[in-house]
């Protein structure tokens, strides 16, 4: 109870981290944009990431996985990559670091810093991984203007669907109504 899981998909492990559900609530805002992952766009991004990791491995053979890669390594091989491949790799490396930092922020009870990680994650998904859409960006942007929303980002594979928002418990209903009204009016 009052925990979230930090999943390690490389080693198939999980860790429980304390999470103050009595103070915050996780709320999903649905963009009502249907994502069609079968069109191959997400698979293209995955392939671009694998291509980039392969280029990094050639120069740095000790780097077996993205979690071993650094931004310094990526900058060394940047000119050997297509710009889109570089952007995907940059997002992946930064997202791994955000995940580690975010887990530490939660362990230390720093919800504000964790929320900033959520917003940074969305920016990376939007600008580097290119899986957001205007509707998701609108929902995250509107949430970022509300003090009682600690953080927000798209969730899932992107290209539509929902945002996940970390909202102070006492303000959930009011904020949900505000966001719904603004979204319907746009």
Segments (PLM) and residue ranges:
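C-terminal nucleotide
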Residues: 2-151, 165-186
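Structural motif
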Residues: 161-163
